[in-house]
């Protein structure tokens, strides 16, 4: 209640004082109010009015610098009107003129009260502002957190937990068993360090979690906080640097000062690449401030002070931009790769997230895990949540396989659009998708077809889905060529059925992808006549922390040879696609008829059509 009254008084008091000051000023200076309400007239026109006998009375103010004149205005039928006239400094002839014309005039000296109130009003308003700002600064200085703290810029914004209760333990983390094992050792060290020190082991000073977004790096940190019985500090890398010089380094010092007081403890820095980027390339003062912050971080982690009992756990998905001094042993003794989960990892993650969902007994998590290669843990959690929302939308009480499959399609390809009307365009799209599906079926190294559909999603008017048999960590040349042939089969089918002049832009994305794959075969994988040589630009991107300018190291002759080889690969694959499609034209016509009628063909039905024709 007291805080509320303080806020009310703090807001109302300056307003009341301001209103009182203005009212007092206006009360003592009625002449000014009179002047404000008057119209203005030039001095020359005023003299003309005197000569025309249209002036009745003149009142002089401000030491004869201003005159309020009572005139007869001929423009409004001779009615009287008050006007204001600014007089020149030397206007002695004015008094003579007024006397000669027998015009009543009077001089009004300045009031001492008015001058005093005017002086006080000019002084009081800035004084109120200064006192109010000082009150806010005092209040912010007493507080330990929150915005508007002018004296606390150098204080670290880390969240401190004596025994963090995040609600997450290692049992809640699945699919990244290797990373869990490494971090469980650190938790065990904090709980009972004697069994480690007995054999001469020392506690790691830093652990860097590296991996793509959504793989569970922050989740692992929460699990550490939930498992360890040690003090836990958490902060984001972006919270160190501010607009003021020196604030970042000051916050690093403050953070580690607090951490040393609670040692042994854990400091978790999320997105450390925001402050730990490679030094020496940026332009401008902002980069200098970031480098000062990084230098202070390096000193605190392994400087002259030696072992402090503070374990730093950091997370990043951009290890390539981090400064090499930050990555050396003694600062980050362990670099733990948190990769995208394989099929077994995805299955374990799905089991964890499905515990709190009402899943129908017919749902096969193994099939879902196989259908989601490349999905991170966050993607899988989002998948089941989307399926749950879709279940409620459809009025069901349990999540079925249909909702999960539709959610996978939505996440990968976007929202489902309106079905196409029966037309020539619909048949053209059907031939395009049937070309992809049939060509892939007759390529021994290609993934099997999972579904063919004419339901639009995002920019795609039709889609052909493939189901990989397993996670492909190593891809062969035959597999890459098979993917290129199947991708070009859509354009090839359009040309076979409708002729070259009628091909559409529908294959634009296919052409973009196959060009990239073919160029990778030549310049990176050494799978061409150019030979096993890496021709990619090895320099890093501009401004990510290493090189200021990118360099192109290939000769013009080699660039021409690469382009020629890429065109040769794509041309050969296109010819093979046309050959496969021409040999199976009747099968493709059957698939197209089914597609136009049903709009979606699942894997079992598609294979039944293929087996009947073959």
Curated annotation (Swiss-Prot):
Q: Which residues bind Zn(2+)?
A: 432, 436, 510
A Pfam match: Peptidase_M41
Question: What residue intervals traverse the membrane?
Answer: 8-28, 117-137
Asked if the record carries the keyword Disulfide bond, the reply is no
User: Which residue ranges are assigned to the Stromal compartment in the record's topology?
Assistant: 1-7, 138-614
Q: Which free-text remark accompanies the cofactor?
A: Binds 1 zinc ion per subunit.
Q: Which domain of life is it from?
A: Eukaryota
Instruction: Quote the SUPFAM superfamilies the UniProt record gives.
Output: FtsH protease domain-like, P-loop containing nucleoside triphosphate hydrolases
Which Gene Ontology CC terms are recorded? Answer: chloroplast thylakoid membrane
Cofactor (UniProt):
Zn(2+)
Name the family: In the central section; belongs to the AAA ATPase family.
Q: How does it assemble?
A: Homohexamer.
Protein name from the UniProt record: ATP-dependent zinc metalloprotease FtsH
Originating organism: Cyanidium caldarium (Red alga)
């Amino acid at each position: 209640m007291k805080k509320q009254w303080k806020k009310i008084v703090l807001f109302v008091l300056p307003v009341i004082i301001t209103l009182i000051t203005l009212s007092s000023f206006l009360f003592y200076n009625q002449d000014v109010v009179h002047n404000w309400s008057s119209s203005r007239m030039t001095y020359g026109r005023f003299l003309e009015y005197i000569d025309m006998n249209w002036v009745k009375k003149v009142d002089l103010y401000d030491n004869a610098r201003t005159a309020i004149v009572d005139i007869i205005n001929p423009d409004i039928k001779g009615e009287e009107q008050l006007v204001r006239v600014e007089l020149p400094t030397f206007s002695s002839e004015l008094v003579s003129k007024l006397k000669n014309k027998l015009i009543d005039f009077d001089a009004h000296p300045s009031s001492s009260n008015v001058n005093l109130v005017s002086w006080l009003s000019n002084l009081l308003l800035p004084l109120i502002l200064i006192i109010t700002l000082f009150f806010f600064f005092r209040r912010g200085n007493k507080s330990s957190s929150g915005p508007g703290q002018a004296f606390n810029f150098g204080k670290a914004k880390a969240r401190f937990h004596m025994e963090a209760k995040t609600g997450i333990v290692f049992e809640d983390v699945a699919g990244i068993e290797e990373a869990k094992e490494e971090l469980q050792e650190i938790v065990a060290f904090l709980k009972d360090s004697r069994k480690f020190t007995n054999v001469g082991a020392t506690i790691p000073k830093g652990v860097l979690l590296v991996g793509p977004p959504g793989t569970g790096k922050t989740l692992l940190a929460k699990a550490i906080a939930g498992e360890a019985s040690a003090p836990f500090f958490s902060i984001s890398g972006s919270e160190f640097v501010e607009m003021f010089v020196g604030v970042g380094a000051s916050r690093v010092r403050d953070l580690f000062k607090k951490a040393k007081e609670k040692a042994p403890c854990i400091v978790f820095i999320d997105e450390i690449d925001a402050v730990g980027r490679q030094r020496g390339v940026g332009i401008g003062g902002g980069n200098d401030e970031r480098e000062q912050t990084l230098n202070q971080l390096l000193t605190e982690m392994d400087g002259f002070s030696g072992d402090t009992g503070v374990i730093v756990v950091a997370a990043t998905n951009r290890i390539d931009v981090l400064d090499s001094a930050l990555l050396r042993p003694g600062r980050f003794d362990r670099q733990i790769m948190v990769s995208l989960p394989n099929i077994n990892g995805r299955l374990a993650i799905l089991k964890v997230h499905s515990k709190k969902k009402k899943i129908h007994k017919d749902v096969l998590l193994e099939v879902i895990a196989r259908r989601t290669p490349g999905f991170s843990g966050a993607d899988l959690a989002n998948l089941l949540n989307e399926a749950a929302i879709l279940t409620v939308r459809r009025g069901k009480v349990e999540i079925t396989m249909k909702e999960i499959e539709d959610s996978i399609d939505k996440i990968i390809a976007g929202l489902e659009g309106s079905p196409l009307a029966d037309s020539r365009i619909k048949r053209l799209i059907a031939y395009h998708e049937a070309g992809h599906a049939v060509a892939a079926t007759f390529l021994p190294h290609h993934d099997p077809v999972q579904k063919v559909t004419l339901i639009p999603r995002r920019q795609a008017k039709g889609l052909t889905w493939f189901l990989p048999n397993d996670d492909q960590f190593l891809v062969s040349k035959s597999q890459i060529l098979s993917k290129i042939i199947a991708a070009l089969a859509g354009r090839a089918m359009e040309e076979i059925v409708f002729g070259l002049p009628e091909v559409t832009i529908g294959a634009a994305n296919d052409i973009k992808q196959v060009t990239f794959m073919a160029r990778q075969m030549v310049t990176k994988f050494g799978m061409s006549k150019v030979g096993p040589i890496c021709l990619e630009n090895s320099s890093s991107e501009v401004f990510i922390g290493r090189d200021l300018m990118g360099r192109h190291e290939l000769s013009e002759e080699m660039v021409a040879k690469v382009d020629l080889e890429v065109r040769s690969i794509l041309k050969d694959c296109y010819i093979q696609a046309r050959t496969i499609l021409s040999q199976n034209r009747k099968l493709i016509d059957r698939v197209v008829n089914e597609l136009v009628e049903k709009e979606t063909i699942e894997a079992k039905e598609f294979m039944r059509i293929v087996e009947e024709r073959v």
